[in-house]
Amino acid sequence: QAATAHLPSAAQVDVLRGPLAQLYGNAAGGVVQVTTRDPRPGGAAQAGVALGSYGQRLVDASLDFGDQRLGVLVDLSHFEIDGWRAHSAARRTHFNGKLVARPDGRTRITALLNLYDQPLAQDPLGLNLTQFQSDPRQAVAVATTFDTRKSVGQNQLGVVLDHQLNSADSLQLRAYGGTRQLTQYLSFSGAAANSAGGVVDLDRGYHGVGMAWTRALRMQSGLPLTWTVGLDANRMSEHRQGFVNQSGVSGDLRRNENDRATNTDLYAQLDAWISPRWRAVAGFRASKVRVEVDDHFITPANPDDSGARTWRHTSPVAGLVWSATDSLNLYANIGRGFETPTLSEMAYSSGNSGPNFGLSAARSRQWEVGAKYKGENQQLDVAWFDTRSRGEIVPVETVNGRSVFQNVDNVRRRGLELAWRAEMGAWTPRASYTYLDAYFGNPYTGAGGAAIAAGNRLPGTARHTAQLAVDYAPTTRWRVGGTLNLAGAVFANDTNTASAPGYAVAGLNAGYQLGDAAPGSTRWQLWARLDNLFNRRYAGTLIVNDGNGRFFEPAAGRRLMVGVRAQFL
């Protein structure tokens, strides 16, 4: 779950895309990898507070202690917001802890503890076009009638052991476990005898282990070659219940089942320099995924929905990189992947009945070619990609917050990605652009028997998006910056009869620093940001194929946030 990533203590965020991301496993068309920073040797502490428009309140604090042999980082934050829209308040508390131990020069042990508590996240629901245009801050009537909201609690612990066996071989062992509790009140009662209920209650436990062996050596040519083999095994058990929503109060039982999902993956990767300027990468991942449902709510109106599905697939990938110059690399990658439906995607079938065991895994073929240039003061990335999938898992309908999915063949995504960054003295400009041509290659029948024509665009995808930003730091104390985000129109349904218009949204930010980074000193940071500078009205997200026509989730208007942070070094 992306919400549990704790960005205040992150050292870096990496976005891995393209065919080589398939090596990360099932559904890895892309990977967002958040790495928590290591504890600072010698110790440090910091605390901050921020206030913003619409009742935004944020406090956070972190503490580092220990040395190079044993270090600990603890980070705690709390956020609240009254909400820009009616019925959109939320609050959450997040703890992130990291321990790094180096018992000897060849061994590193890393432990991560993440605790996430979100007791309240009100849902104002989507708006239809008339509501969106007349008053984007409103909540629809059923949101207050049924008190639509969600609470989430997730705790997880992971341990990684890295050990250098000898000069060529290294071993990594991983283990993790966690729990997740979710209660969600939807915008209908779910009182019918064959309904799954209008209140979702999940209690989930999950754990897994993994190992990887890496050998780094040199070929007879003297060029490096590295190979890795590994094994992952994961298991998730879930108790899913559904209750009648009695105007925001949980009522009679309507669903009761135990769900299980397991996967076992074997993978290997080879990385070799075949000449001083040519590098080849190849690998595969063989996966077995099984999903089981054990139904315990069986009545004459609600028959036994127990069942199971198993999927097996091998995802091969290959890539080639040419170092044309010391600053320019050209590359090409190709691969195949697959995506099994999640328990959430299988949870409902048409007619508001039980699990959708007819949902199949999606299979894709993708390739990309690109170039990466890194000069003395600027860098440029260019990539052209093409992905074609069979059995694409798409939402056929979403009614009252509940989504039903189906498979669609010959879904195509192709496009161009550009990213540029430069350092020009005190100025740091950045720009990125994406052209995405995503469409259904075959006709199919959607919700309510609607005919979806070949060539219709995938809903929720903009053909053009761009980001422009510039930072200016005239001194080591001052910094100011501006951003501009642009996006084209986006269709909201498979029939392409409803759409959200494109938008251009600007923002400003500034910061001032007091003190220096000398050990034993205190450094103060003052910052401010102004989002949606010109108070543009636009849809931040869409509820694709909403059965009630409430597709649009408005983004917040102009908003200001200011904060102060103290660092004790």
Which residues are covered by each model-predicted region?
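Transmembrane beta-barrel wall of Gram-negative outer-membrane proteins
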Residues: S53-E80, R85-D123, T148-S167, R279, ...
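Membrane-embedded beta-barrel scaffold of Gram-negative outer-membrane proteins
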Residues: D60, D162, S170-L186, S323, ...
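N-terminal periplasmic accessory domains that precede
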Residues: Q1-S9, V15, A27-G48, V59-L63
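C-terminal beta-signal and adjacent terminal beta-strands/loops
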Residues: R477, L486-F491, Y512-L569
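Structural signature of Gram-negative outer-membrane beta-barrels, strongest in the C-terminal barrel
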Residues: M219-N234, E257-R388, T434, D471-A473
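Short loop/turn motifs that connect adjacent beta-strands in outer-membrane beta-barrel proteins
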Residues: P39-A44, Q68-R69, G105-R106, Q164-S170, ...
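Gram-negative outer-membrane beta-barrel transporters
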Residues: W213-T214, A280, K288, Q379, ...
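Face-selective signature of the C-terminal outer-membrane beta-barrel domain
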Residues: R106-N114, S151-I298, V321-S323, D381, ...
